[in-house]
Amino acid sequence: MGLFNFNFGEKPATSEKKAEDFGRNIKATLEFKRHQDPGKDQATGMSADWLTEKGKTASIQDGKAIEENSVKGYASPKKRAQETVDLMLDNVYTSPAYSVDVINKSTASLEGTGAEKLNNNQREENKFNIRTRQELDATANFVKIMPIASAWAEEQLKGGAKLDKYSLIVQWYLDNPEKCKENGVLTGHETAAEIAERVAVELGMTERFYRNSVVRLINVTHGPKIEPFLQELVGFKNLAEIGGALQPGESINFAVRIDANKRKTVKLLFRDKEYPIDEAQIKALAQEYRDRIEGRK
């Protein structure tokens, strides 16, 4: 299914599509989620590219909790992110009285239909039937700064720091853009621009949904990807201000509402708090990402 060809919501009575058929009475949730609990690479301290049983169980439970009429999932190219989405989509609750339209079916649900052959030519890293997005990928070369950030976090803990070690590692990342540049790691601001690109695209997509759509778009990414983006939007200096870094499986959500007159409101929801957002700020950040990608060509 093409990126902009979402047939969510109330379909037009005829095959002729008119402007008034789209972008009215829309309820959409754009979910940006850290993948569920992964294994651990003991040599580097980084996440291994698979989910633990705990992570798999949590993904299944998240899928069962989905209530929107239509849902679609995207993920980082990493398997642990794809598996998180795959398990969610494969466990969306349906019954004769209530049905959720899962736009991209999981690999398991394709077995025996012949459609599973579509996956035979996928690269190994694209193991699941999930649309991957490079903007959601893990921060490249983060392993190069992990020893420095980890050592700093240990020192902070010895000094009585209240945050957990992982949150302190993310805090070091946010506070040291120059060290990141020296090690070939994207800065927090650059990482924020990647997530902004995905958010900007999906905010635009909501305006092209059929009228009366109730949709959830799931985007599974990594730590620390969401925290720098949150810092740009919310303006905190220390992660303690928002309760620490995101834990495995934790999300931020954009609640999008478009009324019958195409007036759109967007709120950022995180840890039982609502934050107003500036779409222009998100678009500007996204443009930085696009300019950076264009500069590589």
Regions found by a protein language model. Give the residues of each.
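Short acidic, low-complexity segments enriched in Ser/Thr/Gly/Pro
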Residues: 129-170
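Low-complexity intrinsically disordered segments
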Residues: 282-296
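Short glycine/proline- and acidic residue-enriched helix-loop micro-motifs
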Residues: 157-190
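Residue-level preference for the first positions of well-ordered beta-strands
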Residues: 30, 212-220
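Active-site-proximal alpha-helix that buttresses catalytic centers in soluble enzyme cores
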Residues: 4, 8-137, 178-197, 226, ...
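Active-site beta-strand/loop microenvironment that shapes enzyme catalytic pockets
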Residues: 217-229
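A short, acidic, amphipathic alpha-helical segment used as a generic capping/interface helix at domain edges
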Residues: 195-210
